[in-house]
């Protein structure tokens, strides 16, 4: 149970998650980090079984490093997404319980966002939410998303979406993490006033 959100705009990609980690109906951790840095230009959110996610995302991180060493350039995000799709598809019938948003910026596609589920299905998205709080977050995204929105507006919308989930979903809570990925600055964590308000509620 969790909420993760991704938004792609012209300037870059925004990933946002809540911080609550649950085991069934038990709150196991209140400061969980659910955004995994794969490389400077790409990251993924974590929704599903923690051990499975850590395993799969470790594979992706290793693949990104191998690619960079071999070809002297960052791995294209589509290649990384194809790789995770194969891992998830060929793990059947012993599937990884993984639902992840993979987003970043590369030379081939610019700012791009993909969703991968535990069966290996991959879809390209402009905005997406996963986890138990996703119905609430997706509603906020559908109302607020615009194709021409700025990166700053996308950060605000991502926070609103996760906040909507925190207010309505018992599996989401404790605060919000936000990461922005741009071509110029790469991967960076963002902290905003809205997050402080969420933490105080």
Curated annotation (Swiss-Prot):
The formation of the proteasomal ATPase PAN-20S proteasome complex, via the docking of the C-termini of PAN into the intersubunit pockets in the alpha-rings, triggers opening of the gate for substrate entry. Interconversion between the open-gate and close-gate conformations leads to a dynamic regulation of the 20S proteasome proteolysis activity. It is found in: Cytoplasm. InterPro entries: Ntn_hydrolases_N, Pept_T1A_Psome_bsu_arc, Pept_T1A_subB, Proteasome_bsu_CS, Proteasome_sua/b, Proteasome_suB-type. It catalyses: Cleavage of peptide bonds with very broad specificity. One of its GO terms (biological process) is proteasomal protein catabolic process. It is an enzyme of class 3 (hydrolase). Gene3D superfamilies: Glutamine Phosphoribosylpyrophosphate, subunit 1, domain 1 (3.60.20.10). Residues 1 form a propeptide. GO terms for cellular component: cytoplasm; proteasome core complex, beta-subunit complex. The active site is at 2 (nucleophile). Its EC number is 3.4.25.1. It comes from the Archaea. Pfam families: Proteasome (PF00227). Keywords: Autocatalytic cleavage, Cytoplasm, Hydrolase, Protease, Proteasome, Threonine protease, Zymogen. Component of the proteasome core, a large protease complex with broad specificity involved in protein degradation. Belongs to the peptidase T1B family. The 20S proteasome core is composed of 14 alpha and 14 beta subunits that assemble into four stacked heptameric rings, resulting in a barrel-shaped structure. The two inner rings, each composed of seven catalytic beta subunits, are sandwiched by two outer rings, each composed of seven alpha subunits. The catalytic chamber with the active sites is on the inside of the barrel. Has a gated structure, the ends of the cylinder being occluded by the N-termini of the alpha-subunits. Is capped at one or both ends by the proteasome regulatory ATPase, PAN. This is Proteasome subunit beta 1. The gene is psmB1.
């Amino acid at each position: 149970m969790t909420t993760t959100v991704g938004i792609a705009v012209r300037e870059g990609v925004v990933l946002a998650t809540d911080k609550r980690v649950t085991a069934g109906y038990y709150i196991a951790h209140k400061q969980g980090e659910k955004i995994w840095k794969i490389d400077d230009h790409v990251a993924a959110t974590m929704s599903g079984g923690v051990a499975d996610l850590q395993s799969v995302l470790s594979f992706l991180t290793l693949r990104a490093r191998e690619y960079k060493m071999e070809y002297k350039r960052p791995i294209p995000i589509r290649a990384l997404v194809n790789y995770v799709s194969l891992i998830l598809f060929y793990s059947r019938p012993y599937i990884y319980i993984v639902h992840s948003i993979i987003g970043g910026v590369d030379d081939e596609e610019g700012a791009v966002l993909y969703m991968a589920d535990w069966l290996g299905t991959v879809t390209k998205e402009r905005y997406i939410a996963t986890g138990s709080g996703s119905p609430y977050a997706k509603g906020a995204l559908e109302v607020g998303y615009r194709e021409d929105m700025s990166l700053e507006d996308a950060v605000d919308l991502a926070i609103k979406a996760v906040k909507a989930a925190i207010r309505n979903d018992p599996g989401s809570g404790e605060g919000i993490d936000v990461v922005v990925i741009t071509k110029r600055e790469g991967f960076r964590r963002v902290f905003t006033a809205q997050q402080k308000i969420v933490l105080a509620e």
